[in-house]
Design a protein with these regions (language model features):
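Short beta->alpha connector loops at strand-helix junctions that form conserved
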Residues: 17-18, 240, 257-261, 279-283
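Nucleotide-sugar-dependent glycosyltransferase catalytic domains
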Residues: 1-170, 182-204, 210-213, 303, ...
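Active-site donor-binding acidic/aromatic loop of nucleotide-activated sugar
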Residues: 214-223
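Short internal beta-strands
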Residues: 170-176
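Short, well-ordered beta-strand core segments
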Residues: 14, 88-89, 236-237, 255, ...
Length: 383
């Protein structure tokens, strides 16, 4: 939400962008409010209103303080910002989330924005290549949950190892979640008790020991580029972050998502709805091993994933986004100028008729003349 205020101060065009759908629709709920089962179009619609309402009330005071003290702008309200009229660029694939029919013309689903062939200097070590190329008929899966911080990393390792052994697969395990917790404990310094430091070290050693116990079945890495690895293996298991989900689907790999929070549940359910994989809410040996058996043996799922991957690889997300920017540039300029004019017009009234900070709480629902739908803005709580 900071960009819109900076654009107003600089008097430049402004576009919004996000890797998950945030624009109001009746087609599906807000990604942060995904229910356990469908609740209907009205529920879907209201999740966006309530989310925007909650966010604005949480940030309004600091936002207006930033506007006044840093940008030299007067306070504003969600109604005056009219964020629903600003051009939006969504960096996900329309093959995964098609644009809803109730989205307006300036809301674009461009396709994923991939950075191909980045000059990182990374190269796989010989041990990793040997593991992938080993003459072993068992399919290889990738398992990694990003930088998620968990309370018991050893338990996650235990579940992964037991599930892999039960599923007749081999696994490349990326330990980002546990190493981050271990590093944090190591950095606590001399002020922490030696006993705690020794415990953290022991925990880290336990994780390494159990992963190294089955060298022909499990290979542990700290990190590996997804665009290099995923096309070489059978399936991927991850937390459902937008970027990792995109990488797995682009490679045409069946996907298991274990969501932890936020939009990860949305992507997990979308993958399962499309027949591209499984979403498991609880990380248990029973759940993970069952899902691993499906993604490693279901040839129809692999076929569907390959078809979707082919479509995604044909997309030109970055190029499409650039074209959308040029197409809607004048509209973006007009939106910024309209915001400036509204601020200038109401500045005197606001400063003389409202108490300081009252704008922060303004929340309304008005009939949006441009869309013919109810928009966040002019419903005010009863005094």
């Amino acid at each position: 939400m900071v960009g819109i205020h900076m654009a107003e101060a600089l008097q430049v065009p402004y576009f919004r962008s996000f890797p998950m759908p945030m624009t109001r629709t009746r087609s599906f709920p807000h990604p942060f409010a995904t229910p356990n089962h469908p609740k209907g179009r009205l529920y879907n619609d209201m999740t966006y209103v309530l989310f925007d309402h909650a966010v604005w009330r949480a940030i309004a005071s600091r936002t207006n303080s930033f506007r006044r003290s840093t940008l030299g702008l007067p306070s504003t309200t969600y109604e005056k910002l009219e964020v629903w009229k600003i051009p939006y660029l969504y960096s996900f694939s329309p093959h995964i989330v098609p644009s809803p029919l109730d989205w307006l013309d300036w809301i674009h689903c461009t396709g994923y924005w991939f950075l191909d062939n980045p000059q990182t200097g990374w190269a796989p070590d010989a041990a990793l290549k040997a593991f992938i190329e080993a003459p072993d008929s068992r399919p290889i899966v990738y398992i990694g949950f990003g930088s998620i911080i968990v309370s018991d990393p050893f338990e996650i390792i235990r579940v992964i190892v037991e599930s892999v052994l039960l599923s007749n697969v081999r696994a490349i395990v990326s330990q980002g979640w546990s190493s981050r917790l271990h590093d944090k404990k190591q950095q606590e310094g001399a002020n922490e008790a030696t006993k705690k430091e020794a415990g953290a070290k022991k925990e880290g050693n336990q994780e390494e020991d159990i992963l190294k116990k089955y060298p022909d079945t499990i290979f542990s890495v700290q990190s590996v580029p997804h665009d290099w690895l995923f096309p070489k293996i059978r399936a991927v298991v991850h937390h459902g972050g937008a970027g990792t989900t995109a990488a797995g689907l682009r490679a045409g790999r069946p996907t298991i998502i274990k969501p932890f929070f936020a939009d990860q549940f949305f992507w997990g359910e979308r993958v399962e709805e499309m027949g591209l994989g499984r979403c498991i809410k609880q990380l248990t040996v029973e759940n993970l091993s069952a899902a691993l058996r499906v993604v490693s043996t279901d040839e129809n799922m692999l076929r569907v994933a390959n078809q979707v991957g082919h479509k995604i690889r044909q997309e030109t997300g970055v190029e499409t986004a650039i074209q959308c920017i040029y197409r809607d540039l004048e509209l973006a300029k007009a939106r910024t100028m309209s915001s400036i004019q509204k601020t200038a017009k109401t500045n005197y009234v606001t400063s003389t008729s409202k108490k300081d900070g009252e704008d922060d709480q303004d929340w309304t629902l008005i009939e949006d003349a441009m869309s013919g739908s109810i928009s966040p803005g002019s419903w005010k709580p009863a005094d």
